[in-house]
Amino acid sequence: MNAEQILQTDTLKTLYFTSQDTVLMTDGTLQTCDFDSPAIESIKQLVKANPEQFGFDFEPDLLVRFTSRSHITQWLNDISKEVPAAPSASLLQQSETATRAKRVLEQAVLKGSSDIHIELFKHQTRLEVRVDGRMIELMKPIGEYEYGELLIGYLFNELCEDKDDDFHVGTINNGRMSLLLDTPKGKRETQWRLAYIPAKDKGGQCTLRWSNKETSIPTLDNIGWEAGHVNVMRDFMNSASGICLIAGQTSSGKTTTIAAALSEMKRQGRSINTVEDPVEFDLGVIQTSVTAKQGQDNHFNAYTKALLRHDVDIESHGEVRDELGAMDVCRKGETGQIMFSTLHTSSAVGIAHTLNEQMHVPSALLAAPDLMKLWIYQTLVRTVCPHCALSLEQAKETWSEQQKTHFAVWQASMASFNPKSLRFRNPEGCSQCVEGEKGRTTLIEMVVLDDDDRALILSRDYLAWLKALKVKGFKSVVDHANLKILRGEVDIFSAAGRVDGLFPKDTNAVYQGLWEEV
């Protein structure tokens, strides 16, 4: 047998490349290297529903025959090398691509993914998803360029309601789409933000962010903060005016935090408006979704300026990205409103440097009395699965020598702790988790700005400012990580992957060891 005897449609090829263990031959037999493969039943159902499409009548049951995995692999490689169809897909091909797209999205959704990455290479398509912050394969790599090209093209050209342009493999593109899908919480309308960037060899990457994944808004008491953090935020929420900025990486929970705060503040006698790109939570207040168009750098500013005429008490801007956006936030804070916004930087103290040095907000404005009130940095770290977590003694058996050294350094930096309270991820995992972890919790640090802070911000002496904060008892994100490690909530090495400085470093020892022979 050879690849020419394999029946091929887009739907069948999706099943072949997804399972990589079963194919349907022109004589109506199924060749498989795994009799338990789910692909066998999927192909049977497909043929039963469409017997005329495959050139033979459906028998009571298709004959399943065993073949080696090497044969299957070779046949799939041969299929992927065949000349692709013309770019203008037939109606049948488009229909099959639509089925493929929905299947990919539903697989990702049912895994609890926040993002889908479709990576297009010269002779291969890769599909990966982000679950609890970790990138994992959605399916095995598909040895075909056309698979990914058609999939991305269909998403942009047929499903996107708002996009920069029609899809072209060599052009940056952005868009949004909505699709009814089966989710872990039942069938519902899912909303996606798409971004595409080209790469070498006519490749590229399409990233899909599930923007309305969460169906409910958590309370401030349930986002992983300590009670003291919540009290500080509520003090700010009850103030007359001022700015709260929340920093962090992409997917660090910043928008969720603001949603929790605004949800608590609504219907309390104050007018609330948000300007977002895009709207992610339904807050029950006036929310404006801003659409970026090519060549329009000030689109966000036009909306925020319009809100000056709308008698707003509390306002939230999705993200500060540039000088214009930063000055908008400062302007609103000066007009007597409570302002929330987010930005990308790596610490709460770093907000000052980012706004001043990168976005050119004058230090005098940042240090203005009662303007900047609360700066927060947060990140998300995976939590240890309670069903298969390891004790310290069990975990040590799985660690590398480097991990043992790091743990010893961390242990020496702790004043005292109960080793029995520590818990570590089980690399083998269980049916309830992925590699020993399930879900995520928040690690944060807060700066509650006072006049001493403002004086040091004005002088731009950020190292002195950090020292002064520590004297006052400032709790850093490292401190919060250590607290949750000691409680057994998070694995120390998972936390170290999200928080710098968890393992203290002696730079003298580092430099002296650079040329030591291993």
Residue map of PLM features:
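Short Lys/Arg-enriched alpha/beta "domain-start" segment
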Residues: M1-T14
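N-terminal "pre-motor" subdomain/linker immediately upstream of P-loop NTPase catalytic cores
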Residues: D10, F17-D57, D78-L245, Q249-S252, ...
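Walker A/P-loop
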Residues: T255
